[in-house]
């Protein structure tokens, strides 16, 4: 999700999207699909405590984007099939300091074997 994408489009997306704050990736906002998947109780909680079905590599990707300040994507194999996780840094426009990340998780098609997980 980039800064140029209309917030209404992100909110209306049928795929889970969320804004995570700080190095603990506290969930500050989720679209309807995210809240349907993880519940309103997820707001304010660290992503690692809420999004337990995601593999460790998803959180490593979020950490890397937060640390390096550049967007990255990764294919993940989840129980529902193959998904693409896109993580984009959110930074202060004046200082450039990263204060959070946005995530967008979308299904990619038929299931694949876990050993086929790769970086895009």
Show the residue positions of the predicted features.
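Sensory-domain boundary/capping and coupling elements
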Residues: 110-120
């Amino acid at each position: 999700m980039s800064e140029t994408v209309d917030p209404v489009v992100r909110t209306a997306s049928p795929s889970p999207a969320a804004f995570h704050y700080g190095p603990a990736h506290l969930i500050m906002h989720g679209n309807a699909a995210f809240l349907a998947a993880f519940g309103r109780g997820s707001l304010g909680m660290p992503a690692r405590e809420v999004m337990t079905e995601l593999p460790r590599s998803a959180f490593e990707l979020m950490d890397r984007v937060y640390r390096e300040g550049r967007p990255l994507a990764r294919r993940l194999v989840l129980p529902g099939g193959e998904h693409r996780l896109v993580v984009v840094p959110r930074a202060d426009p004046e200082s450039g300091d990263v204060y959070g990340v946005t995530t967008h998780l979308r299904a990619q098609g038929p299931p694949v074997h876990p050993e086929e997980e790769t970086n895009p």
